Regions:
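Cofactor-binding active-site loop characterized by glycine-rich and histidine/acidic residues
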Residues: 1-70
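Acidic, glycine-rich active-site loops and adjacent beta-strand->loop/helix elements
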Residues: 2-4, 51-58, 82-85, 117-119, ...
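Short acidic, glycine/serine/threonine-rich loops at helix termini
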Residues: 10, 60-62, 88-92, 149-154
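Conserved thiamine diphosphate
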Residues: 42-45, 92-125, 175
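Generic beta-sheet signal
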Residues: 45-49, 76, 135-143
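A short alpha/beta connector and helix-capping loop motif
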Residues: 58-83, 138-141
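Histidine/lysine/aspartate-rich catalytic loop segments that bind and position anionic ligands
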Residues: 71-94, 98-104
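Glycine/aspartate-rich loop-and-adjacent alpha/beta segment that forms the canonical ThDP
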Residues: 119-178
Length: 178
């Protein structure tokens, strides 16, 4: 029962997820380890890590970013979903991580900041990451939580862990039988 897109990515439910992590930032440290192993073993693969801005307040994330920059892991692409919200409220009100792109550049990361709702911008940022040699890539995705669904995005931080009813789902999909 439930969704294959739970609030925390689950490798047992979501295709393409190789490791389950959570809100404490361990996922990036593991991604750095996977990318480093690929370099040591001379394997030709990319490692992708998706973080939220709330979990990016964790010290472990900053240690992993610094290490990735120092190791020049050009086979690692990190996305940070910068929707400016976390479970307890607005990220800036709790513990601001801005200016995120400037901090990442100081760690020797190839850093891009884009509209996270623009698919073409994401594709271009990925191509730029693939073309970058000797630097880990970090892509900051500026997003709006609930983008495109007014009755969700208007809730602000209150939509962080909200559930929707079956009736809301049907209304959103515009179908009686979903």
């Amino acid at each position: 029962a439930g969704t294959n897109l739970p609030s925390h990515c689950d490798m047992n439910k979501t295709i393409g997820i190789d490791m389950t992590a959570g809100s404490l930032g361990q996922g990036l440290s593991c991604a750095v380890g996977m990318a480093l192993a690929g370099k040591i073993d001379k394997k030709d693969y990319k490692v992708f890590c998706i973080l939220g801005d709330g979990e990016s307040q964790e010290g472990q994330v900053w240690e992993a970013l610094m290490y990735a920059g120092n190791m020049r892991l050009d086979n690692l692409v990190i996305f940070i979903d910068n929707n400016k919200m976390q479970i307890d409220g607005m990220t800036d009100d709790i513990n601001s991580i801005e200016p995120l792109d400037e901090k990442a550049k100081a760690f020797n990361l190839h850093t891009q900041r884009i509209n996270g709702h623009d698919v073409e911008a994401i594709e271009q940022a990925l191509q730029n990451a693939f073309d970058t040699k000797d630097k880990t890539s970090l892509i900051v995705l500026d997003t709006i939580k609930g983008y495109g669904v007014d009755w969700v995005s208007s809730k602000g931080a209150g939509c962080h862990s909200m559930s929707i009813t079956e009736a809301q789902w049907r209304e959103f999909c515009g179908k009686e039988d979903v």
